[in-house]
Amino acid sequence: MSGMHGASREALAAARERLDALTDSTSVDAGSLADELAAVTALLHREVSLRRVLTDPAQSGEAKAELAQRLLGTQVSGTAVDLVAGTVRSRWSQSRDLVDALEQLANIADLTAAQKRGRLDNVEDELFRFGRIISSNTELRAALTSRSATTAAKSELLAGLLGSRAERTTERLVTRLVTAPRGRSLESGLESLSKLAADRRDRMVAVVTSAVPLSDTQKQRLGAALAKVYGRPMHLNLDVDPEVLGGIRVQVGDEVINGSIADRLEDAGRRLAS
């Protein structure tokens, strides 16, 4: 989804603005809207010919919107129909981009529901921790990505793992990702969800790795320092790695701030060798 260009990028931005306007209303159930958008995503993923018709540049935006309204009018709420109709009115560079966009809107709606309940921070942290669990547990990853396992079996496994321990939003997001990966790896999907969660508060995400857990004071100071450097609020995803001999390693996007003893030793070794 981050790979959208040109018309699709503009269309996605417009769709996100429409979604934000809708979910700002207290009368809109963001969680239910997420379910409906996810159902439309699944439909268009399956029905390639329909997807192509709804993104055909030779058809007027109004004609495509009317088609979406006829097809979905009795299947989902009026709010969901209006949002999808507005989305297909836009021009899309590729038909797949429309499906990616609707999936992203579903995820944002779920995150908005969590934000309204004051639980967004919990969801962000749980997504990060689940990603770490997946990266260190090859058996669990294999079970969740197995092509031979049924959707029901994967959902049941996730319910057992997350149901009583995690936020409902976290379970919903991860279950959708696992049961409908649409060609993505589990890791990249979780990373995308984490970025969306951070975007809900217009924050950047810093992955902080330290040899020992940071104190609350250290976390607050680091967050404030990074916010000052980057000019935006910063959410810290914390990880402990005993192999980091001391100090802290911080990664923000593709940028790595090397402040650990291990890095300083490696830099010193390179200087001696040169």
UniProtKB/Swiss-Prot annotation:
Q: What topology does the record note for this protein and the membrane?
A: Peripheral membrane protein
Query: Pfam families this protein is in?
Result: OSCP (PF00213)
Which compartment or compartments is the protein found in?
Answer: Cell membrane
Q: Which residues form a coiled coil?
A: none
**Which keywords label this protein?**
ATP synthesis, Cell membrane, CF(1), Hydrogen ion transport, Ion transport, Membrane, Transport
Q: Which GO terms describe its biological process?
A: proton motive force-driven ATP synthesis
- Quote a single Gene Ontology cellular component term: plasma membrane
Give the HAMAP family listed for this entry: ATP_synth_delta_bact
The UniProt function text for this chain reads: F(1)F(0) ATP synthase produces ATP from ADP in the presence of a proton or sodium gradient. F-type ATPases consist of two structural domains, F(1) containing the extramembraneous catalytic core and F(0) containing the membrane proton channel, linked together by a central stalk and a peripheral stalk. During catalysis, ATP synthesis in the catalytic domain of F(1) is coupled via a rotary mechanism of the central stalk subunits to proton translocation. This protein is part of the stalk that links CF(0) to CF(1). It either transmits conformational changes from CF(0) to CF(1) or is implicated in proton conduction.
The record's NCBIfam families line, in alphabetical order, gives: ATP_synt_delta, PRK13430.1
Name the family. Answer: Belongs to the ATPase delta chain family.
Q: Please describe the quaternary structure of this protein.
A: F-type ATPases have 2 components, F(1) - the catalytic core - and F(0) - the membrane proton channel. F(1) has five subunits: alpha(3), beta(3), gamma(1), delta(1), epsilon(1). F(0) has three main subunits: a(1), b(2) and c(10-14). The alpha and beta chains form an alternating ring which encloses part of the gamma chain. F(1) is attached to F(0) by a central stalk formed by the gamma and epsilon chains, while a peripheral stalk is formed by the delta and b chains.
Kindly provide the name given to this protein in its UniProt entry. Answer: ATP synthase subunit delta
Give the originating organism: Streptomyces coelicolor (strain ATCC BAA-471 / A3(2) / M145)
Q: Which gene encodes it?
A: atpH
